[in-house]
Regions:
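Short, charged phosphate-coordinating catalytic segments
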Residues: 1-24, 115, 121
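Short, structured motif recognition centered on aromatic/hydrophobic residues
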Residues: 1-3, 9-11, 28, 46-49, ...
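Short, basic (Lys/Arg/His-rich) helix/loop patches that form interaction surfaces
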Residues: 4, 58-61, 79-116, 133-135, ...
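Alpha-helical DNA-recognition elements
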Residues: 17, 107, 119, 130
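Basic, alpha-helical nucleic-acid-contacting "clamp/cap" segments
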Residues: 21-73
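Helix-turn-helix DNA-binding helix
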Residues: 124-127
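Alpha-helical linker/edge segments of TPR/alpha-solenoid repeat scaffolds
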Residues: 148-150
């Protein structure tokens, strides 16, 4: 939630198929296209989460593909339950997500962050503007349309 500024509703919809490992060992998570690289130590924790999932011992979920399976058949963990678990750890989820998104748009152009993490361009551009990003003059859009120098 905090590392990639994702809401709990999007996190609980992740499946184990959204977590991949490249031949070189780099771990990726798919929120948008292309998949986003996950830095250590979070990559190791994420891989552990794919193999040590809760609620798989119930009769309703033995083959669940959800990264966070819920107790109901075919359903992921409820987003409010995940949010409560995070709050119980002392982490204010909304404030943390906002801070994470601000940090991300300070490191990369807002349209790049939007595409990689599944946000709208408007959301990341607004957050970038509020954060005083150095990328505020970045020309978003499809740059492949422009003629290439010869």
């Amino acid at each position: 939630m905090l590392l990639f500024a994702q809401p709990a509703t999007r996190i609980v919809r992740l499946t184990i198929d959204d977590i991949t490992r490249a031949a070189d060992g780099q771990v990726f998570i798919r929120f948008g296209e292309p998949p986003t690289p996950v830095p250590e130590p979070f990559a190791t924790l994420l891989l552990q989460a794919t193999t040590q999932r809760d609620n798989l011992q119930t009769a309703t979920n033995p083959g669940a593909r959800w990264l966070f399976p819920g107790r109901r058949a075919g359903q992921p963990l409820h987003a409010s339950h995940l949010s409560q678990l995070v709050r119980d750890l002392g982490v204010p989820a909304l404030a943390g997500r906002t801070a994470a998104l601000r940090q991300l748009v300070l490191q990369a152009p807002a349209p790049v962050v939007a595409q990689a993490l599944g946000f709208t361009h408007g959301t990341t551009t607004r957050v970038a503007s509020e954060a005083g990003t150095p990328w505020s003059r970045y020309a978003s859009g499809d740059h492949s349309r422009w003629p290439q120098p010869e």
